[in-house]
């Protein structure tokens, strides 16, 4: 499960600065859900290839209503959802009454808390941070979020237990394995017999026997539970809302037409009598973790309410995660033709940035159109895991360049040399050439659409990266021949005479 890191502290200690640095975004609003998480921002971050979700809580100032009230209103839920809490303080301001109140609350929580002193740039950190040990939260980690100093080492230590749980090895053991694999490859030997067996499974065979994991996501009360029950079969009356943490998604195996699936249910499958509840608890963290863990994301939209900002936020997070997408518009039955046309126009206008995703109009309650969702889920998964040879990718690239030449850059034509696969799920294509990094965004979109049409890729984003062609002679001096040496001597003699 993707770990969750919460940033907690009073106002102006640098939480948003650290959040923006971790999410590599200036506005950092990767997922902002009005009315549900009004005072919390959710983002996606990566440190040393370790993915995690970071939550920026509202500043807690105990001067007005009391520290406990503010904590309950803004940050208590974020702390409950998190695996790690980074309690941020201002090294320049020293210990405040608000810091003491927050520390008292955090000590009562069964969470791993790291005390982080920010704004230590230009200061004697040890002197200015000494007072923070009085908060009794252990070691004080010194960082400068605005410059990034100390951030990586802090996150590496905070996420180390989750890294070990994920790989079964410590970071040191993982690094040793990487070194062994590198030298084994360099010497032309294999590290383990298992590696040989893995190499035999190439292409789509590697994924053929694996179940397709798809997550059903959407705003509260759009029909996620109804759709899940419809897919599983109405006679299946099982309570999947097990006791325990509220942010754990439920993984339900499903088989249809000899294809195995795993449904990641973020709402919980409930008994029939509870399906029609008017209020459904919506956990942002649970939804974001389900997106991270899925192969395909099925976004459910309420036809009667249209596309909301929350839907767009969920789509944005899904695209950022590189997941395949299928869109289902629920509650389509009972609408008149004029209303349906208006809804379709609105969908086309607001969802233009995901025009590669299949859109289905369904009724989860009555089952109409639900069966077609499986075809699109399979199509999206196969598109995302499709193996394409270098020769095919290069040939399509050349065809695209012939149909529409790359533009001139500083008076010179951009030259595309060759293309190869850089990864899958989602497909990543690396194009090599001269001045390719100067290509305008319009031509990049043209290449993506050309590849999508040529390879019949639907339901998954395509990422194209450009690499400049290296000059093999750059930095090297040509070795002169004897004739060239004699010619240079003659020229030098004429210069001296002159």
Curated annotation (Swiss-Prot):
Positions bound to GTP 1: 9-16, 56-60, 118-121
Domain EngA-type G positions: 3-166, 212-385
Sorted keywords for this record are: GTP-binding, Nucleotide-binding, Repeat, Ribosome biogenesis
Q: Name one GO molecular function term.
A: GTP binding
Indicate yes or no for the key word Nucleotide-binding. Answer: yes
Coiled-coil ranges (or none)? none
Q: What does this gene product do?
A: GTPase that plays an essential role in the late steps of ribosome biogenesis.
**Protein name per UniProt:** GTPase Der
For this protein's source organism, the top of the classification is: Bacteria, Pseudomonadati, Pseudomonadota, Gammaproteobacteria, Aeromonadales
């Amino acid at each position: 499960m993707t770990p969750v890191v919460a940033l907690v502290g009073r106002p102006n200690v640098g939480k948003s600065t650290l959040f923006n640095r971790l999410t590599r975004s200036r506005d950092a609003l990767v997922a902002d859900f009005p009315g549900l998480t009004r005072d919390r921002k959710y983002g996606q971050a990566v440190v040393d290839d370790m993915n995690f979700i970071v939550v920026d809580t509202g500043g807690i100032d105990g001067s007005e209503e009391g520290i406990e009230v503010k904590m309950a209103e803004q940050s208590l839920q974020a702390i409950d959802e998190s695996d790690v809490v980074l309690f941020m303080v201002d090294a320049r301001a020293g210990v405040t009454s608000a810091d003491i109140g927050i520390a008292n609350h955090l000590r009562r929580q069964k969470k791993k808390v790291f005390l982080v002193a920010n704004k230590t740039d230009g200061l004697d950190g040890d002197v200015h941070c000494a007072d923070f040990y009085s908060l009794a939260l252990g070691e004080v980690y010194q960082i400068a979020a605005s410059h990034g100093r100390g951030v990586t080492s802090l996150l590496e230590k905070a996420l180390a237990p989750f890294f070990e749980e994920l790989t079964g090895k410590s970071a040191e053991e993982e690094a040793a394995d990487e070194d062994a694999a590198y030298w084994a490859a360099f010497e032309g030997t294999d590290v383990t017999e298992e590696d040989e067996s893995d190499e035999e499974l190439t292409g789509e065979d590697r994924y053929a026997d694996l179940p397709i994991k798809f997550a059903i996501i959407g705003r509260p009360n759009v029909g996620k539970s109804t759709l899940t029950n419809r897919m599983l079969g109405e006679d299946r009356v099982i309570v999947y809302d097990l006791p325990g943490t509220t942010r754990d998604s439920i993984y339900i195996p499903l088989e249809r037409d000899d294809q195995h699936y795993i449904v990641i249910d973020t709402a919980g499958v409930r008994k029939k009598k509870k399906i029609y509840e008017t209020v459904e608890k919506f956990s942002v963290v649970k939804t974001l973790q389900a997106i991270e863990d899925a192969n395909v994301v099925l976004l459910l939209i309420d036809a009667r309410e249209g596309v909301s900002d929350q839907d767009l936020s969920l789509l944005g997070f899904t695209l950022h995660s590189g997941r395949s997408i299928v869109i289902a518009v629920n509650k389509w039955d009972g609408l008149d033709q004029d209303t349906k046309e208006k809804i379709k126009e609105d969908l086309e206008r607001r969802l233009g940035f995901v025009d590669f995703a299949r859109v289905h109009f369904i009724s989860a309650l009555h089952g109409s159109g639900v069966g077609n969702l499986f075809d699109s889920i399979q199509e999206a998964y196969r598109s995302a895991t499709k193996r394409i040879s270098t020769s095919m990718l290069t040939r399509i690239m050349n065809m695209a360049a012939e149909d529409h030449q790359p533009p001139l850059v500083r008076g010179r034509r951009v030259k595309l040399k060759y293309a190869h696969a850089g990864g899958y799920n989602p497909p990543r294509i690396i194009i090599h050439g001269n001045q390719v990094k100067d290509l305008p965004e319009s031509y990049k979109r043209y290449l993506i659409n050309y590849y999508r049409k040529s390879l019949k890729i639907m339901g998954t984003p395509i990422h194209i990266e450009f690499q400049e062609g290296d000059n093999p002679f750059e930095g090297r001096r040509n070795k002169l021949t004897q004739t060239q040496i004699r010619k240079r001597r003659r020229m030098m003699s004429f210069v001296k005479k002159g």
